[in-house]
Amino acid sequence: MSKPSVGINGFGRIGRLVLRAAVEKDSVNVVAVNDPFISIDYMVYLFQYDSTHGRFKGTVAHEGDYLLVAKEGKSQHKIKVYNSRDPAEIQWGSAGADYVVESTGVFTTIEKANAHLKGGAKKVIISAPSADAPMFVVGVNHEKYDHANDHIISNASCTTNCLAPLAKVINDNFGIIEGLMTTVHAVTATQKTVDGPSGKLWRDGRGAGQNIIPASTGAAKAVGKVIPELNGKLTGMAFRVPTPDVSVVDLTARLEKPASLDDIKKVVKAAAEGPLKGVLAYTEDQVVSTDFVSDTHSSIFDAGASIILNPNFVKLISWYDNEFGYSNRVVDLISYIATKA
């Protein structure tokens, strides 16, 4: 089977890292990129140099309106570059892009993302939560994808991708009665470098580098969409903190069946080494956030930081590279749905 051909709309943090993940994994072929705000020579620069994940360990250049991205031992990606503001005008079909990653953060509903299908794409994967597109989390519910009907899908959020695999393992083994999640989350591009206006969410407009900022997140409630048994049982919030990348989920839950911390560690480790290998990881090391920069897992369970009050009330800690781990799952989701074509 030939590799799925992919287009990327929006060459921001996630768009560029999806391309990096695609080059590393060598499982999909990126054939087109669209961004109306970035010239092709600037794309080369932004892709080559990354303050968080380091310099791209390969070659990147441009020839006419094509980006040429290569890495030793991997396939070269010859990528047609478009600069269209209207997604309906992007010629995905003529570039051969069957699967489009919608990573602008703008076209996140079925109606808006549908414009990509007009340009010749067959499937659209939104790299953000969606109000109405079905959400799939690799390792949790990706097998519920329906090729005949699911043309526009969401890869959910980075936080849902961290929380859902852990919640699945705990719920499958011990049952979750209810739970609260907090994510201590790295800054993202929507935040302000210094205090500024921010619509109705006044706290979100405060300086990202100087504050711990309480913020809302739908990530915990979204777990109920990907694990229906947990619908209505989880909610959560976020603290935005002044770090550039890597976040951590704290899941505090009441369990149906009593469990010791060792019981929990055992089932999480078994899942990380078995059915959720590559998605969920397990560590007993004395780690901190920078230890997970560029980690490709969705969720890394921190056995040493997790605690229990009693056998039915637990606090579980799991790390995630909110940029790169998530981008790897976008590529994995495309690889999976392509097998159903």
Swiss-Prot record:
Catalytic activity reported: D-glyceraldehyde 3-phosphate + phosphate + NAD(+) = (2R)-3-phospho-glyceroyl phosphate + NADH + H(+)
UniProt-recorded Gene Ontology molecular function terms: glyceraldehyde-3-phosphate dehydrogenase (NAD+) (phosphorylating) activity; NAD binding; NADP binding
Positions annotated to bind NAD(+): R13, I14, D35, R85, N322
Enzyme class: oxidoreductase
Site for Activates thiol group during catalysis, residues: H185
Metabolic or biological pathway: Carbohydrate degradation; glycolysis; pyruvate from D-glyceraldehyde 3-phosphate: step 1/5
GO cellular component: cytosol
Keywords (A to Z) from UniProt: Cytoplasm, Glycolysis, NAD, Oxidoreductase
Signal peptide: none
Broad class of where this protein is predominantly found: cytoplasm
Catalytic residue positions: C158 (nucleophile)
Family statement drawn from the similarity comment of this UniProt entry: Belongs to the glyceraldehyde-3-phosphate dehydrogenase family.
Xref: PANTHER family: GLYCERALDEHYDE 3-PHOSPHATE DEHYDROGENASE, GLYCERALDEHYDE-3-PHOSPHATE DEHYDROGENASE-RELATED
Protein's recorded name: Glyceraldehyde-3-phosphate dehydrogenase 3.1
Native source species: Caenorhabditis briggsae
Taxonomic lineage: Eukaryota, Metazoa, Ecdysozoa, Nematoda, Chromadorea
